[in-house]
């Protein structure tokens, strides 16, 4: 089965998405997500100018060979743009292969390892009580795992907190907005949130928290220690992961489980953290870590060290990514949890999908392929809109991690 054509579709139904569609001489098509928040056009250009010309005429079934051709042949390996482009090709080819077999994608990976995929939602509020009420709402919707973020007194804005509780989108302007950050105020306030949540809801539900790379290792150790009484499912992105030895210092100070990896692109980004057992959950994604083919390698390595998966699944990844991730999740033996932020109605209309949510779990559906398509006519009604992620400054004006 030969690849006869491929094209990039950029659309913005409430936020920007980049989709690669591959066509074959047997009439089968497949799609893959290539969205890189705030850098969408860089990936679109990479695909159009450098990848698609190399795909035409190749055997669509030779997924592994094509993956290595795009990775090894480029010489300039790794990086979010390259790996997001490769991921789009990989996901589209797995979609085609599963459609050709007449099977849902997870069957080609090895079949189900579980009946459903536990997902966590995002509860947030301007203050602790508002966040607490949002957690209650997620519990009413059936969620068993909930990420909790709250506004911090004295800060005009805080990561993960939005006026629209269900559809959080931080990329809010053509040029980056500048936010003010205070580590001291944050460290003082966050334990109070989880004290309130456990006091109201007890320990029947999993609670998670995203630090979003904002702490130094010793500050992260302090936060993890202060959160131990509340038995979090995980503390996410406690410190920038470029310095992987930092997680050793955090480990020495707390038993709060650690999760990291949404910005990772290859197994090499995760190898030392996994092999040294410095993390408990690896959050690499289908889109930014080279597709299902490469994510399997990361998960296989993690399984050797009892590290579980917790794939990133925010709304800056399209339903195409979510569909593929759920097929991966329902198969992967060392599954932990899947992030699930609901897309808007406009996005779901552009990307009709087979996956569904019920009682805290999701299933990918059983249609052939990964179960997500794109309505190109509808997508064309939502042109690209320049949007950038914010930046942070400390109260004295120093640029800080966002």
Swiss-Prot record:
Manner of cofactor binding, per the entry note: Binds 1 Mg(2+) ion per subunit.
Supply the EC number(s).
Answer: 4.2.1.8
Q: Could you say which cofactors this protein requires?
A: Mg(2+)
Q: Keywords of this protein's UniProt record, alphabetized?
A: Carbohydrate metabolism, Lyase, Magnesium, Metal-binding
Q: Where is Mg(2+) bound in this sequence? A: 210, 236, 262
- Which molecular-function annotations from GO does this UniProt entry contain? magnesium ion binding; mannonate dehydratase activity
Catalytic residues, per the record, are: 159, 212
Report the catalytic activity: D-mannonate = 2-dehydro-3-deoxy-D-gluconate + H2O
Q: In which pathway does it act?
A: Carbohydrate metabolism; pentose and glucuronate interconversion
- What is one GO biological process annotated to this record? carbohydrate catabolic process
Question: Per UniProt, where does substrate bind?
Answer: 37, 122, 262, 283, 312, 316, 339
- Please indicate which residues carry the site annotation Important for activity and substrate specificity: 314
Which Pfam families would you find in this protein's record? Answer: MR_MLE_C (PF13378), MR_MLE_N (PF02746)
**Enzyme class name:** lyase
Q: What does this protein do?
A: Catalyzes the dehydration of D-mannonate. Has no detectable activity with a panel of 70 other acid sugars (in vitro).
Family per similarity comment: Belongs to the mandelate racemase/muconate lactonizing enzyme family. GalD subfamily.
Q: What is this protein called?
A: D-mannonate dehydratase
Organism of provenance: Rhizorhabdus wittichii (strain DSM 6014 / CCUG 31198 / JCM 15750 / NBRC 105917 / EY 4224 / RW1)
């Amino acid at each position: 089965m030969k690849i006869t054509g491929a094209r990039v579709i950029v659309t913005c139904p409430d936020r920007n998405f980049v989709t690669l569609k591959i066509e074959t001489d047997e009439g089968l098509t497949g799609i893959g997500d290539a969205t890189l928040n705030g850098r969408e056009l860089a990936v679109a250009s990479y695909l159009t100018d450098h990848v698609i010309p190399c795909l035409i005429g190749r055997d669509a079934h030779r997924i592994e060979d094509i993956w290595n051709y795009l990775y090894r042949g480029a010489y300039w390996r790794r990086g979010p743009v390259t790996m997001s482009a490769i991921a789009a090709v990989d996901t589209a080819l797995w979609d085609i292969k599963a459609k050709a077999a007449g099977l849902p994608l997870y069957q080609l990976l090895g079949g189900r390892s579980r009946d459903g995929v536990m997902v966590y939602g995002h509860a947030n509020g301007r203050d602790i009580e508002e966040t607490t009420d949002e957690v209650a709402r997620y519990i009413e919707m059936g969620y068993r795992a909930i990420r909790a973020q709250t506004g911090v007194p004295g800060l005009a804005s805080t990561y993960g907190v939005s006026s629209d509780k269900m559809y959080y989108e931080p990329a809010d302007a053509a040029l980056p907005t500048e936010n003010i950050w205070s580590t001291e105020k944050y460290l003082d306030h966050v334990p109070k949130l989880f004290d309130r949540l456990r006091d109201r809801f007890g320990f029947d539900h999993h609670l998670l928290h995203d630090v979003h790379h904002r702490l130094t290792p010793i500050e992260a150790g302090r936060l993890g220690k202060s959160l131990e009484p509340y038995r979090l499912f995980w503390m996410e992105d406690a410190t920038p992961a470029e310095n992987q030895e930092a997680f050793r210092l955090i480990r020495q100070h707390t038993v709060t489980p650690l999760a990291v990896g949404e910005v990772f692109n290859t197994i090499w980004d995760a190898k030392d953290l996994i092999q040294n057992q410095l993390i408990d959950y690896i959050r690499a994604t289908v889109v930014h870590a080279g597709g299902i083919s490469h994510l399997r390698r990361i998960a296989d390595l993690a399984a050797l060290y009892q590290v579980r998966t917790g794939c990133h699944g925010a709304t800056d990844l399209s339903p195409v990514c979510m569909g593929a991730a759920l097929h991966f999740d329902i198969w992967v033996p060392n599954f932990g949890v899947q992030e699930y932020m609901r897309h808007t109605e406009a996005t779901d209309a552009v990307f009709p999908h087979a996956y569904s949510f019920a009682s805290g779990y999701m299933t990918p559906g059983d249609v052939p392929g990964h179960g997500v398509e794109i309505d190109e006519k509808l997508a064309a009604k939502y042109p690209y809109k320049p949007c950038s992620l914010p930046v942070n400054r400390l109260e004295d004006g120093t640029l800080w991690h966002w």
